[in-house]
């Protein structure tokens, strides 16, 4: 994917300000909302099952993140994902720490029934879904990109989703086109809690304005990586890197 495509997608986000429904975890809400606002999108943290499905009909994209799952939140995710699926709207599955507990894996299995447009996770999370084997240290990955590339390709073919594996290097595959390997940004970015969750939200914004899910996902990863690199040049540590990334996304 060219830099021109990434710039075009980012410009479209700014022009159209897509409404992105984020059913995400307590830890990530603030950062995800600020990243979306900075990029030019409109975040909505609507998760209650009494309205999540109805609201999804209004949104340009839905993002379902299982970081802090509970029965009602999972019901809200399922309702929103079902609405998005039936309406042909894009939605992103972020399977946070899916290998940590059987409840998380069961939740992901339930959500996969609604055919996510994109699955974005770290190497361990993607490996768990692809191979049905537990792995990872909670939200952290103990697998490498080399461990997961073939499994990510197979998962993309099997699920019909674009699969994005993020880490020191990012990997994007739809199981058909040549996979993309992109730089992961500043090496301190993993020290910022919930930045990956915010990246999934940014992916939702890009999907809402660009029909090619493979290109939209790659554009989101490129935007975050570039913002991280620019922010890292002036950041003293993860705290300043966090707010500088938001500033860079707003430029």
What are these regions (language model features)?
Residues 40, 87-88, 160:
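Glycine-centered short loops/turns at secondary-structure junctions
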Residues 180-193:
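Short pre-catalytic strand/loop immediately N-terminal to key active-site residues, enriched for Gly-Thr
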Residues 225-251:
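Charged C-terminal helix
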Residues 103-179:
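Conserved phosphate/ATP/ADP-binding segment of small-molecule kinases
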Residues 1-43:
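Glycine-rich phosphate/adenosyl-contacting loop at the front of the ribokinase-like
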Residues 128, 191-222:
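Short, small-residue alpha-helix embedded
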Residues 65, 73-122:
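Glycine/small-residue-rich loop that forms an oxyanion/phosphate-binding "nest" at active or ligand-binding sites
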Residues 151-156, 213-228, 246:
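Short, well-structured alpha-helical segments that form the helix of a local strand-helix-strand
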